[in-house]
Amino acid sequence: MKRLLCFLLSFSCFFFGACTEGEKNEFQTVLDSTNALHKAQISMVSESSIRDFIPSLPRTEVGFTEAELASLTKSLNRLADESKSVTIAQAKQDVNLLFRALRYCYGPYGYFGGDEAFDKAQTAVLDDLSVFGASFQIDKLIESLREHLSFLQDAHFTINGKSLVDRYSYFSSEEPEFAHDEAGYYAVLDGYKQYISSINGATDVEAYMKYSISMDGRLVYYIGTLSTQTEKQLSITVSFENGMRELTLSKVVDRQTYDTKIPYSADWNAVVPVVACRDYMQQSTFQSFVEDASWLSSEPTAILDLRGNRGGSEQAVQAWLNSYDYYGIARNLYGKGYFSISSRASNYLTAHTLSAFSSLGNSAALYDELIYLYQHGKNSCVLQRDNAKLRWNNAKKLLFVLMDSHTRSGGEWLLESLRTRGNTVFIGTNSEGMLLSGTGQYISLPNSKIHFTFGNSLLLTYDERVFEEGRGFLPDLWVSGDALERVQKLIEYYGLAP
């Protein structure tokens, strides 16, 4: 795909101010190549079977007294004060409760090694406590838990508000601008083509060359990379045929041009309709988003803005997909395999954290149902997708999907399904990378007040070539916070509006 644009595509529109019919054909060639890439990625899925990770729980055993479960839900609205102290006896009680909660309620428990891995981690934490003394600060317990649970590469899993997964951010520079021809990647510097020979000493520069959109709507290349470093800038050395240049790549700031306080909006009067959704956690937002999906699907060219979308329940995602394309991409929700644990303990915990899930509707009725299942139900596992294959959908209408590093969880459920739709182009930066599980369980350890979030589900989907926790999905065109303005310029420049 990255070798499709020639010198004329990158620069003729700049000089002459309008896109020719030939350049429209060039965009179609790029679109065809994008379709081919997405179609090939359908087979790039986890090799594991979801059934290998279904927990084996005693049918009726709760695993806790009701007093213990109640103690885990008393301080859900605040994090622990890490400067306070606990006794070793209190810490041991907390550790015991935590690992039991993981055993009975954590969806990826088997995925991350089951009893063998978690028993080893628990023993290591208890060993640490024995050398901390009779009383110690809570931050020591947190440090021990983070160290020995670091194998939980699940971005939804947090210990006192912090994930164990390193997050990747996009660093880029739009100076200089690059194009590509048969000889390689080049920039026009001082009036001459100058070809890149290496970046940071590596002659394979493909990984650094990011397909993008210029401010006036042209398809171009910029140098960029993903990094887990926390600094706002990083430096690279670009070697040209006639010398070297030091470039400073800046961390892209995503939330520049959209308001996260407006959860949903739809502009049907624009040249190309724009539907923007930042989350579907509230019932009103969720309903509007779903109701408008069928209208969006009828548009010959449309923009779906999922930047900053922090998700919601999978029921909301399923409803939107059903409304948008019931017989097509809706079939691909839940990836290759998906299950959720419905243990008696997890039902109790979920019932007491319902305020976080208002998109599910009548919380009072759901609370009563969950408490009934806790009191009278049995431990079970709901298998919603088993060793399925993703299916490609040859859609004809053009859809641009905007995404950024704040598109996560339920927002990424939509990205996952939309990747199986033809003529769909993803624009922005990498998504946050939070798909493996969810956040259905909130607990606070009774003595230390250390707060945990984790999910009772497990999703197997694309493998690390397409998606990774903490790195997310990658866009087709890498654009910073002004992605909406640039895609509108792209549509105007290449004459893509109906």
Predicted regions and their residues:
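Active-site-proximal beta-strand/loop segments in catalytic clefts of secreted hydrolases
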Residues: A276-Y280, D305-N309, R331-R344, L402-H406, ...
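C-terminal motif of bacterial Sec signal peptides marking the signal peptidase cleavage site
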Residues: F16-A18
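Flexible, low-complexity junctional segments that flank or bridge functional domains
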Residues: T20-A319, Y326, N430, T439-P446, ...
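Extended C-terminal subregions enriched in glycine
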Residues: L398-T420, V425-G433
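Glycine- and acidic-residue-enriched helix-capping/beta->alpha junction motif
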Residues: L296-V382, R419
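BRCT (BRCA1 C-terminal) domain core and associated BRCT-interaction motifs
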Residues: R421, F426-K489
